[in-house]
Amino acid sequence: MSKEKFERAKPHVNVGTIGHVDHGKTTLTAALTKVSAARFGSAAQDYDQIDGAPEERARGITISTSHVEYESPLRHYAHVDCPGHADYVKNMITGAAQMDGAILVCSAADGPMPQTREHILLSRQVGVPYIIVFLNKADMVDDAELLELVEMEVRELLNEYDFPGDDTPIVVGSALKALEGDTSEIGIPAIEKLVDALDASIPEPKRDIDKPFLMPIEDVFSISGRGTVVTGRVERGVVKVGDELEIVGLRDTAKTTCTGVEMFRKLLDQGQAGDNVGVLLRGTKREEVERGQVLAKPGTITPHTKFESEVYVLSKEEGGRHTPFFKGYRPQFYFRTTDVTGECVLPEGVEMVMPGDNVKMIVQLIHPIAMDEGLRFAIREGGRTVGAGVVAKIIE
C-alpha cells in the first residue's frame, strides 16, 4: 500500500475513544473511518484491523494502540483506540497518544459503568481538555425516556469531574448500524453529526511553536571568549538572539540573555520547537547552570517540589518491580533530563501499590523542578523505569 503524501491543507487534531469495555469504542472507530471514506475518499478500516492493535513501547511500557485517520469538512483527525482498559490507563498517563479531545462512548442500553467514570477521571487528571459523548447502541433502546435518563447520568458524571456536563455535545446513534450502511437517523447521519460536533466543540490546538519558549538543558559548555552555551532540544516556542530568558529549576531562578543560537555548528537567528540547539548565554557562568534545569521565557514556568499525580506502576512482565511499594516509598522521579528523589504519599486508605496498578499520589521532591500541569515523568530505581506518571495538580 503506497503512502500518500501527508496533506497539510487541513488542520490536524488528535482525538481518541474512551469508555467502558464493550460499549462500542472500536465499532465506533471503524464507523468513523467508513463514513469519512465515503465522504472524502480517505481509507476505511474495519473492526478487525483496528482491534488487532499492534503493541508499542512508550517510555519502556508496552501499550497496544490502534491509530486511524479520517477527515471532516474542516479537519484531518488522527484517532487512537485501545483494545483493553489497561492500555487506556497507560496511554493516557504516559501521554503516548496526546488527545486534544476525547469521544466518550457510552452504551445507551447500559448507561455509565465503572470504566466510564474512571476514563472521565483519568481525562481530568491527565489534562484531556474536551470530551464529546456518543451514546451508542441506540438501536437497542426504544424508550425515549430511558435515553434521556442515560444522557442525564452522563452529564452529571462529567460535571462531577469538572467537565462542562450541561454543555457537552451528546450524539445518539448506533455505530453498528452505521457500519452496516443504515441511513436512518441513528446510522450514518449520527456519525456525520458526531464529526460535526468534533469540528465545533474541540478548538484547534495551539501548535508547540506558538507556545512560550522552553528548552530542557541537557549539557553546559564554556567557550572561551564567548561565554556559556547550554544545549538541548527546544520543547516549545522560539528563541531569538537578544531574548531575555530565565533558568528555572534545582536552584533559585536566574535571569540571562540569549546572545547566540547555533545548530550543527552554524549560527542561526533563532531556534524553534523541535530543533536541537546550543544557546549562548550572556552573563551566566558555567557553574551557575546544570542539566535538569530549563531555559524559558521569563514568567512562563515556575519551580515546584510538591504535586498531585496520576501514576501507572509497571508490571513485573514490563520489567517493573516484583513487589508492591508502601507509603514513604522514595524512588527517583525523572523529569525531562534529570532524576530527582521524591517521597510518595498514598491516598487515604491505600496501604500499598501493586505492580500493574494505577494510583493517584502526592509527590514531595527534595529539589524543585520546573513544571506545569500535564508534565510527564518516569519513576526510576537505580536507572530502571518502574512507573510513569503525569503532574495532575501543583501543590507548592
Curated annotation (Swiss-Prot):
Q: Where are the stretches annotated G5?
A: 174-176
The residues listed in the UniProt record as binding Mg(2+), with positions renumbered to this chain, are T26
Q: Where is this region: G1?
A: 19-26
Against Pfam families, the record matches this protein to:
GTP_EFTU, GTP_EFTU_D2, GTP_EFTU_D3
Stretches the record annotates as G3: 81-84
What Enzyme Commission number(s) appear in the record? 3.6.5.3
Chief subcellular location equals cytoplasm
Spell out the disulfide connections: none
Its cellular-component GO annotations read:
cytosol
Where can this protein be found?
Answer: Cytoplasm
For this protein, the record's InterPro entries field holds:
EF-Tu_GTP-bd (IPR041709), EF-Tu_GTPase (IPR050055), EFTu-like_2 (IPR004161), EFTU_2 (IPR033720), G_TR_CS (IPR031157), P-loop_NTPase (IPR027417), Small_GTP-bd (IPR005225), T_Tr_GTP-bd_dom (IPR000795)
Per UniProt, the keywords (alphabetical) are: Cytoplasm, Elongation factor, GTP-binding, Hydrolase, Magnesium, Metal-binding, Nucleotide-binding, Protein biosynthesis
Protein role: GTP hydrolase that promotes the GTP-dependent binding of aminoacyl-tRNA to the A-site of ribosomes during protein biosynthesis.
Identify its protein family. Answer: Belongs to the TRAFAC class translation factor GTPase superfamily. Classic translation factor GTPase family. EF-Tu/EF-1A subfamily.
Q: Which HAMAP family match?
A: EF_Tu_B (MF_00118_B)
Q: How does it assemble?
A: Monomer.
Listed name of the protein: Elongation factor Tu
Q: Name the source organism.
A: Dichelobacter nodosus (strain VCS1703A)
Q: Cite the source lineage.
A: Bacteria, Pseudomonadati, Pseudomonadota, Gammaproteobacteria, Cardiobacteriales
